[in-house]
Amino acid sequence: MKKRLFLFLLALSLVFISGCAHEEEKLSKGLAEGIEKVEVPSTIPSEGLGNLCSGEEECISFCQNNRGQCEEYCGNYNEKTLCQKLFEGNTIPSDIPSCGDKTEFFNAYPIKLSDLEFIRPLGFIGAAPEHIYPTDHVYFFLKKDTSGHAIEVPIYSPGDVWITRIKEIKMEKPVPDSIDYSIYFSPCREFEAFYFHLSTVTEKIKSEIKPPFRYCQEEEIGRFKQVSCEKDVRIKLSAGELMGTAGQLEWQYSFDLGTFDMRTPALDYANPSRWNERQKHIVCPFDYFKGDVKDKIKSRLGENDILRTIEHICGEIEQDEPGTAQGVWFVKDAKMYARPELSLIHDFIDPKIGAFAFGFLPAEIGLSPDVLHFIPKTEGLVNRDFKDVTDDGNIYCYDKLVKQWSYDKKPEQLVVFIQLTSPTTLRIQGKESNSCGSGSWSFSSNYAELER
């Protein structure tokens, strides 16, 4: 009996084990089939700006009315392609022909030479606190009338180009109800140029400035308060074709020309993450003009009757020297689109002159917005060239500082202390005094900490 019961239980166990194995096989097969049936998306989901918006079209629409939120987000995520496109990235339409290896695009004068006083080079600092970081464009200064205001002069296309963007800026101050235009144009896909501060545009251009706009925003920058609207367009112009006029407005003494060549090696900023893609490829506009036109324009680079004679004749936008004090500095934890705080660089006309450019620094440190010059020294701790100041533990002192546009060259009652506390952090403070003395120096509690 026991033997029969044992055989029955053994047979039942075998059936159970066989059934479990079969079910496991079915389950495994089912899982495999399920995995095979999972559909992989054929495209990656469209890029967005975090929780603000998703997809390029939606984000462009959102940022038209919420530009501040978009700027704050992109300040933390500036590597995003969409951020670069929204905020001065390479926005040249892809169907415009490629530049190839061509480097001569322009053969016409932007302005008649008889209407021109001089051309201010790249890298201008001044008009504090508006231009504390070196400017990315040159200035064409216009002839003046007997009252000292710039005359209204025609402005021309320098070559065969497509206008790709237009910004119409309606001023509230300093001249209420006046209009200022910015025109972005390209001869080919990897190269972009712009004119800023045109007072009028031709009807061919003006007829395209209508809704829907890429964005509209209110902004207040220094002495300017304005509402600007930007429009994507496609307008073909020939070399020498009239684009509009500059001058006439009370505050408008010049118009600007800037250029970006996305084929060039990126500029060697100390902290590349601070700058968008276009800013990494700023170039001298006149390197892309032809022959005689190029030579005659470059011969006018300077300030009033003082010509720039030291290379780069066109000026220099990026002066950072990593691991030293030279270059631009930001308050700690500043976003990508931070307001300008500090530049420790060299003059845009005479690079032998050192220049402090103070922007929106804390008031308690004793340095108000200004540009001050000094003669750099190659040794010692007083007035040392910025490129020689490293994190060596020393405090450096600067005296006999002269205002940028000072006619009598009388030194200010001010000395400035700086110290590189690491290769990427800087301490700075001002003190009312006419001389550094013989040292040594120390900071009080009211100093500012900046970083690359």
Task: Give the label of every model feature segment.
Residues 3-10:
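Sec-dependent signal peptide recognition
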Residues 17-19:
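C-terminal motif of bacterial Sec signal peptides marking the signal peptidase cleavage site
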Residues 21-23:
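Bacterial signal peptide processing site
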Residues 49-83:
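Secreted, short cysteine-rich peptides and small extracellular cysteine-rich domains stabilized by multiple disulfide
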Residues 84-182, 186-189, 222, 236-239, ...:
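Surface-exposed, glycine-biased beta-strand/turn segments
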Residues 148-151, 156, 187-242:
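Short histidine-centered loop motifs in beta-beta connectors
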Residues 179-185, 234-261:
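Short hydrophobic beta/alpha edge segments that flank linear recognition/processing sites
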Residues 379-452:
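Beta-sheet ligand-binding and adhesion/scaffold domains
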